[in-house]
Amino acid sequence: MESMYYIGLDVHKRKISYCVKDGGGKLHAEGMISATRLDLDHWMKTLPQPWSAAMEATMFSGWIYDHLKPHATALKVAHPLMLRAIAASKRKNDRIDASKICDCLRCDFLPECYMASTAIRERRRTLRYRNLLVRQMVQMKIKISALLMESGVSYNKERLHKVGYFRELLATNPDIDEGLRSLLRQCRETVVRLSKIESAMIRSLRHDWLLTERVERLMSIPGVGPITALTWALEIGDVQRFSSIKKAVSYCGLCGAEKSSGNMVQRTPLSKQRNKHLQTTLIEAAKMAPRYSPSLALLHDRERQRGNANRATLAVARKLVAYLVAVDRGKTHFRIADREVCAA
């Protein structure tokens, strides 16, 4: 039986530090290579066989993972925060980091994190780019208001971004000079252009063969629209990786961390260790969901009487996560259980 060789990779923008050890911890090779596909191909030809590798999750890990995956017996990605706690040291450099990652992999002590498939990651990149466009549209709309206010121009803020009102405002308001009018037109054209691109991206994702059926099932849940459904499908990936709804709620950042010692139990505010894209989308969806679901409206009212509106919104968001997990696991359209109907 061939012995396995273990490789730790410390990945950076331009360089990758590596460390190769056998099962007994004997060092076979270490060094540094350029972070390019060609250099990785040359490097892999020098490796002893068979080999498995591990790297820390960074913004550069995706393409390296995809390039090495076909050649490795096993390839893992480590959770950065957990790995930092395990491999804490006074002395730290790229060579030592690669060696520690290699030892964690060799001893089966690597805090592995989930790596979505290439297809999901490519589509997720598109969705996150769409979120960037939305933020830029909001910035342009705020800039339009700021330009008008700093020039002392009166306007109707509820109608400002309506096409007809905006055109009429530019044409008839005497307080808008030619220089300001040009800037306002450019801002408006930017908003329109970004809106068209954003709409086209959402249409392409909704009609994507990999997502169509899944998104349609998720949208059967009251209060879940195309953006929430797409965000869930692409940020979660494989829903089976969550063994319980509580773990899914934690991943979405809808609960606080616990700090307990002795008889003292302390719950912190919402944890920063979460998927921020899912957290934002689910909280926004939870604000609208009670309008479409009597059971969610009842839950919101009950929680609001106990505390404040934010806690009620979080309770609805957690219930939405439970619905999303159930529909995604069962691969069926949403339906309310009989006991929930009776409770409502």
Predicted ranges, named:
Residues 50-58, 101:
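Acidic beta-strand-to-loop metal/phosphate-binding motif
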Residues 37-52:
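Short, basic/hydrophobic alpha-helical segments
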Residues 76-125, 166-170, 262-277:
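Short alpha-helix plus adjacent loop in nuclease-associated cores
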Residues 2-22, 101:
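Gly/Thr-rich phosphate-binding beta-strand-loop-beta motif of the actin/hexokinase/Hsp70
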Residues 15-38:
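Short glycine-rich, Thr/Ser-proximal phosphate-binding strand/loop in the N-terminal lobe
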Residues 263-264, 299-344:
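Low-complexity, acidic/Ser/Thr- and charged residue-rich accessory regions of DNA metabolism proteins
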Residues 127-217, 277, 293:
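Glycine-rich, often acidic, oxyanion-interacting loops/wings at catalytic, nucleic-acid
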Residues 217-220, 226, 230-309, 344:
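Phosphate-backbone recognition surface of nucleic-acid-processing proteins
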